């Protein structure tokens, strides 16, 4: 498997030489560290237990770690009550650890355009019969892409999350592409949810890989979404995940199935599983049931049952677009089905991502992400 460093070197070379030309298609596992040698991993800061997440400091980028993302999904209704989903994600990838701080004016000038950090932004709008997605790439440079602290801002060109304070909220989110765009207001007063063990989120049964991970699953969203030139007033609920690590996947893991579910009893459920590259079966799972007051229940892997019940073929590949999610000890028995089964992200890093409907012991809405298929 192509190693991350060489893969990102290729991406960075194309950016340096050809500006915003799109990189060649890669899979998510290549970018997130599977297949790397231990010596390569040791060049970056490891994820370790006991490091407390602090806010607003941890809203910022963590360049000593290899990968990171700011990941928003929203389930919305337009003025006629029609459901739709919006996704915005900004990824950060590092091809090498940051260089030492500049020692003088000449060093400052040299490092302004020399960076080991690359940003990739994805944006999408999904309805029952349409799915539009687009992406942008840029090196980390103040006039192009980055993360600001006061006020908080994550941006790549004119795709921007902009807060009025150093916290994530209140904020505006703007992205525009040829076939779609959105301008949204985001507010939340709920405490952040630290996933795993106080933000230390294990990604394998043996504990070899982990990330720092927190969420805000209780966001009020309003604004405008434009699709094929028609602008709609929308409102609904959103969810942001913040995650960073130096290796998300083992070489033996091929991808994941991830669900962000908003249930009818006013709780939110995050549940995900990682799959073995040889068998395609789940090798590790995790879940947390969350309340708006900041409390939550961590659910051990042995209590989580995920079963794909319907497949959708897209461009010769099958994607599981309907699932049974069962957590008997929490009286949760759900059928999770895609609002639009054809919501594959046809980008340089392809994956499936789209809004879902929930039926069963609870009703609700949410988002699903499928990688490695």
Regions found by a protein language model. Give the residues of each.
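Targeting-peptide/extracellular-domain and disordered-appendage signature
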Residues: 2-6, 14-373
């Amino acid at each position: 498997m192509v190693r991350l460093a060489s893969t990102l070197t290729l991406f960075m070379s194309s950016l340096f030489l050809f500006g915003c030309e799109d990189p060649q298609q890669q899979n998510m596992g290549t970018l997130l560290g599977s297949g790397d040698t231990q010596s390569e991993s040791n060049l970056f800061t490891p994820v370790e237990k006991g490091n407390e997440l602090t806010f607003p400091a941890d809203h910022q980028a963590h360049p000593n770690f290899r990968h990171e993302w700011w990941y928003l999904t929203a389930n919305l209704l337009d003025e006629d009550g029609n459901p739709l989903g919006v996704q915005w994600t900004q990824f950060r990838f590092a091809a090498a650890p940051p260089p030492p701080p500049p020692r003088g004016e000449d060093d400052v000038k040299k490092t302004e355009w020399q960076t080991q950090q690359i940003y990739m932004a994805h944006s999408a709008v999904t309805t029952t019969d349409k799915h539009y997605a687009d992406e942008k790439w840029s090196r980390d440079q103040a006039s192009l892409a980055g993360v600001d602290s006061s006020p908080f801002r994550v941006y790549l060109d004119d795709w921007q999350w902009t807060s009025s304070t150093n916290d994530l909220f209140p904020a505006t989110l703007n992205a525009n592409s040829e076939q779609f765009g959105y301008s949204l207001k985001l507010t939340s007063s709920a405490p952040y949810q630290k996933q795993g063990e106080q933000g230390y989120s294990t990604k394998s049964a043996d504990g070899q890989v982990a990330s720092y991970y927190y969420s805000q699953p209780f966001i009020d969203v309003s604004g405008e979404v434009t699709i094929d030139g028609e602008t709609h007033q929308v409102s609904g609920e959103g969810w942001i995940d913040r995650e960073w690590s130096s290796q998300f996947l083992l070489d033996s893991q091929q991808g994941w199935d991830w669900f962000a579910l908003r249930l009818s009893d006013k709780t939110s459920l995050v549940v995900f599983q990682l799959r073995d590259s040889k068998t395609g079966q789940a090798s590790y799972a995790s879940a947390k049931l969350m309340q708006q007051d900041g409390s939550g229940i961590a659910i051990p892997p042995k209590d989580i049952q995920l079963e794909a019940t319907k497949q959708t073929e897209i461009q010769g590949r099958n994607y599981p677009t309907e699932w049974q999610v069962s957590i008997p000890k929490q009286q949760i028995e759900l059928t999770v089905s895609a609002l639009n089964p054809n919501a594959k992200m046809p980008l340089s890093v392809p994956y499936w991502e789209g809004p879902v409907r929930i039926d069963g012991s609870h009703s609700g809405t949410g988002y699903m992400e499928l990688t490695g298929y």
